Curated annotation (Swiss-Prot):
This is UDP-N-acetylglucosamine 1-carboxyvinyltransferase. GO terms for cellular component: cytoplasm. Its main location: cytoplasm. Pathway: Cell wall biogenesis; peptidoglycan biosynthesis. Coiled coil: none annotated. Keywords: Cell cycle, Cell division, Cell shape, Cell wall biogenesis/degradation, Cytoplasm, Peptidoglycan synthesis, Pyruvate, Transferase. It holds the Pfam family EPSP_synthase. GO terms for molecular function: UDP-N-acetylglucosamine 1-carboxyvinyltransferase activity. It catalyses: phosphoenolpyruvate + UDP-N-acetyl-alpha-D-glucosamine = UDP-N-acetyl-3-O-(1-carboxyvinyl)-alpha-D-glucosamine + phosphate.
Amino acid sequence: MQVTVNEHDAVERVATATPAGNREAHAHGTDKLAIEGGRRLAGEIAVSGAKNAALPILCAGLLSAEPVRLDNVPDLKDVRTTLALLGQMGMREETDGARVVLDASRVDNPVAPYELVKTMRASILVLGPLLARFGYAKVSLPGGCAIGARPVDQHIKGLQAMGAEIHIEHGYIEARAKRLSGARIVTDMITVTGTENLLMAATLADGETVIENAAREPEVTDLAHLLVAMGAKIDGIGTDRLVIQGVERLHGATHAVIPDRIEAGTFLCAVAAAGGDVTLTGMRAHILDAVIDKLREAGATIDEGVDTLRVRMDGRPSAVAIRTSEYPAFPTDMQAQFMALNAVAQGAAQVTETIFENRFMHVQELNRLGANIAVDGNTALVTGVPKLSGASVMATDLRASASLVIAGLCAQGETLVERIYHLDRGYDRMETKLTAVGANVRRISGSEA
């Protein structure tokens, strides 16, 4: 099976990971969501900035000594952890709502310690920028969600091709280079974080770097657009072949993070499963084509505006087969949500996961709610049932938790989703947004439970 490093995943924010600024600490590790199912959803939901674009973009702030101003930054646990990590290196940061201003002029500690990196795989994204600008980086090997092997060897191989001297010992990657040199890099697999790390490193390298088999995800493209705004020279943006002409230095820039296509897809899926009429605002439909096509196949009516998406659904959805693959195909980060949709659909459908092994941990929990799902290797057969029944379930990772929320919206009675710190890593106030469109969802804090 092909394993792709495809998502900037993290697990739990540690106590030290709340940065300066006015971003509040979110959920306690024992928070739960209580969902009373059976309500139609109607109204408007504003889509937040994309987590998987914001994390590399924050790390790109290391590449310049001038301020980088970012808008539409989501207020998420992973973002706060990244800001804490950057702050420990000497990065100064000012936050005002969804605007973050980064100043890396005084960065003097190019080390990413285990205490922070263990909570978030995306921490590896500091490796390329630190090495390119400072000639040295010491980064702990990452932790993250338990959804399969997501190796960092492609990052290391690419940086070595650019002349870096890299040693791994005592759980740390230690990298040195006087100045990186341009190189032709062919990754063994499509890796999103690998592409981003090598792209950032190449912007300050001496000469031309070509990245073949590059990831084409919109989040990679968004990072590239910021880098160009900072003075980088990049050709082939949005394709699988990136050509970068290194420059001596990058300057400051202003950039708005793209909308979160996975958050948008999750809400579209929720409406398609539970029924209703909801308009998503601040969303670009073209980055969600594969998901929209499948929702239409399931029976949803979706109208695309300039920056809006309206989804309407009456009656039960029809079962739809999905197969995950790299962008622009169906995203692995929407697989669990479609599993919940298929659980209440008419008919049966096969769900095939080609990106990660071990990404069916939500199946057992969905079956606790009355779903009929059988797993065979990397394929699940979902046979729809007329009704799910509320029960206590446990989130195992970020997207699995979203699938349990969708299932809870469709279930009779109360569903209690435990361990929602996973949800808070990737969704900005999900329960608040769902409540605003008529769902009966409330957070039970750890102190109440």
